[in-house]
């Protein structure tokens, strides 16, 4: 009887520990995801300012574009199943409609790739490609992100 009780208690403790570890892992993934999205936002902002001639070094424009292209390839991977948290800006639709989300991310990746292809072009072409990428970003945010 005593061994059974100890076994039950250990099972409960281990299950609770595993659940806590899963939640911590989901929180870490969410923090990483938020870092990636903030980095994308930062590079987007830098591109807007440089293209508008308001701030920044035009010689660094290609660096910001390359960073976005690199980060874009990671977006789909930072939303694994089980990483949705209640206080996250990510809507459950990401996981409920994984195929639709993957398609939206693919549109963003394609637009980021097109922008990357323009990195050495003139500012007007870069601006046009950047605006197209912005539409892809907005499309994803409208369906899969909590309103700001």
Task: List each language-model region with its residue ranges.
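Positively charged n-region of N-terminal signal peptides that target proteins for export
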Residues: 1-4
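Bacterial N-terminal signal peptides
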Residues: 7-15
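A short structural micro-motif
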Residues: 14, 71, 135-136
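Short, intrinsically disordered, low-complexity terminal segments
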Residues: 15-18, 22
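A short hydrophobic/aromatic micro-motif that marks alpha-helical segments and, especially, helix-coil
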Residues: 17, 112-113, 137-138
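Extracytoplasmic c-type cytochrome modules immediately beyond a signal peptide or single-pass transmembrane anchor
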Residues: 22-131
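The canonical Cys-X-X-Cys-His
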Residues: 133-145
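Short Cys/His-rich "knuckle" micro-motifs
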Residues: 148
């Amino acid at each position: 009887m005593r061994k059974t009780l100890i076994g039950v208690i250990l099972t409960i403790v281990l299950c609770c520990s595993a659940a806590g570890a899963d939640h911590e892992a989901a929180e870490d993934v969410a923090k990483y995801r938020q870092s990636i999205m903030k980095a994308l936002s930062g590079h987007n902002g830098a591109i807007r300012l440089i293209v508008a001639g308001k701030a920044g070094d035009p010689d660094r424009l290609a660096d910001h574009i390359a960073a976005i292209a690199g980060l874009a390839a990671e977006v789909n991977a930072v939303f694994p199943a089980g990483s949705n948290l209640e206080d996250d800006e990510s809507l459950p639709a990401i996981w409920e409609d994984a195929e639709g989300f993957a398609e939206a991310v693919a549109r963003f990746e394609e637009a980021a790739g097109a922008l990357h292809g323009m990195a050495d072009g003139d500012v007007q072409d870069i601006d046009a490609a950047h605006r197209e990428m912005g539409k892809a970003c907005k499309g994803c945010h409208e369906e899969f992100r909590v309103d700001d």
